[in-house]
Amino acid sequence: MAKVPDLFEDLKNCFSENEEYSSAIDHLSLNQKSFYDASYEPLHEDCMNKVVSLSTSETSVSPNLTFQENVVAVTASGKILKKRRLSLNQPITDVDLETNVSDPEEGIIKPRSVPYTFQRNMRYKYLRIIKQEFTLNDALNQSLVRDTSDQYLRAAPLQNLGDAVKFDMGVYMTSEDSILPVTLRISQTPLFVSAQNEDEPVLLKEMPETPRIITDSESDILFFWETQGNKNYFKSAANPQLFIATKPEHLVHMARGLPSMTDFQIS
């Protein structure tokens, strides 16, 4: 089965996108007077269990800090925590302090998968056709053929393999080395396979010509081609949790996995 985006990959992206955090804190420690350099008066009894402003015997300029974004961390036991990130924009207010005291166990967050289009603003540049006039067979050895409506595809057992739909595969270039974006066009036609929502049939979308540049808004005709042995998977670029799939008595559609079959053989 092809791999799908997991939580820890999302966390790695989160940290890599915010790697300037540590350098910002280092800069702060070198250029600001230490918070602990100042001496403070003991608290009176009537200040216990309250949020108070600490008075200092020295006059110092407090660094301007604000809560800006969340930094996600995972403990050794697998517990996911949310910690606040500091930046040099606005001063901390008493409201912020009150929030911290009243909510000491702030923000245990649930694992979630970030949508692909949220993480990236991708552009895909056309390179060339890498496969021509090939057929796709599913795990039941059924070939993909055009439905009677001519708008959809379906899987069917064929005696004459010449009746199977033949595809051309165009490959696109992107900055991501770990993915191989491709289009599936019915050979000698302007019809491209177009991904839809989960459990919805894929459409045959007419394009006047092969797109030279594809952006996120047009990524329904783009798929990430993955292989495992002789099995081939086509993951939607518009929704990477969905694959081109077949199921008995159903049109070719988009699915996450079983009971639909998402692997194909190319011949």
UniProtKB/Swiss-Prot annotation:
The modification N6-acetyllysine is found at K82. It is found in: Nucleus; Cytoplasm; Secreted. Acetylated within its nuclear localization sequence, which impacts subcellular localization. Proteolytic processed by CAPN1 in a calcium-dependent manner. Cleavage from 31 kDa precursor to 18 kDa biologically active molecules. Glycans are attached at N64, N100, N141. The keyword S-adenosyl-L-methionine does not apply. The keyword Acetylation applies. Residues 82-86 are annotated as: Nuclear localization signal (NLS). InterPro entries: IL-1_alpha, IL-1_CS, IL-1_fam, IL-1_propep, IL1/FGF. Keywords: Acetylation, Cytokine, Cytoplasm, Glycoprotein, Inflammatory response, Mitogen, Nucleus, Phosphoprotein, Pyrogen, Secreted. GO terms for biological process: cellular response to heat; cellular response to lipopolysaccharide; connective tissue replacement involved in inflammatory response wound healing; cytokine-mediated signaling pathway; ectopic germ cell programmed cell death; extrinsic apoptotic signaling pathway in absence of ligand; fever generation; immune response. Residues 1-112 form a propeptide. GO terms for molecular function: copper ion binding; cytokine activity; interleukin-1 receptor binding. The modification Phosphoserine is found at S87. It comes from the Eukaryota. Signal peptide: none annotated. One of its GO terms (cellular component) is extracellular space. PANTHER family: INTERLEUKIN-1 ALPHA, INTERLEUKIN-1 FAMILY MEMBER. Monomer. Interacts with TMED10; the interaction mediates the translocation from the cytoplasm into the ERGIC (endoplasmic reticulum-Golgi intermediate compartment) and thereby secretion. Interacts with IL1R1. Interacts with S100A13; this interaction is the first step in the export of IL1A, followed by direct translocation of this complex across the plasma membrane. Cytokine constitutively present intracellularly in nearly all resting non-hematopoietic cells that plays an important role in inflammation and bridges the innate and adaptive immune systems. After binding to its receptor IL1R1 together with its accessory protein IL1RAP, forms the high affinity interleukin-1 receptor complex. Signaling involves the recruitment of adapter molecules such as MYD88, IRAK1 or IRAK4. In turn, mediates the activation of NF-kappa-B and the three MAPK pathways p38, p42/p44 and JNK pathways. Belongs to the IL-1 family. The similarity among the IL-1 precursors suggests that the amino ends of these proteins serve some as yet undefined function. This is Interleukin-1 alpha. It comes from Oryctolagus cuniculus (Rabbit).
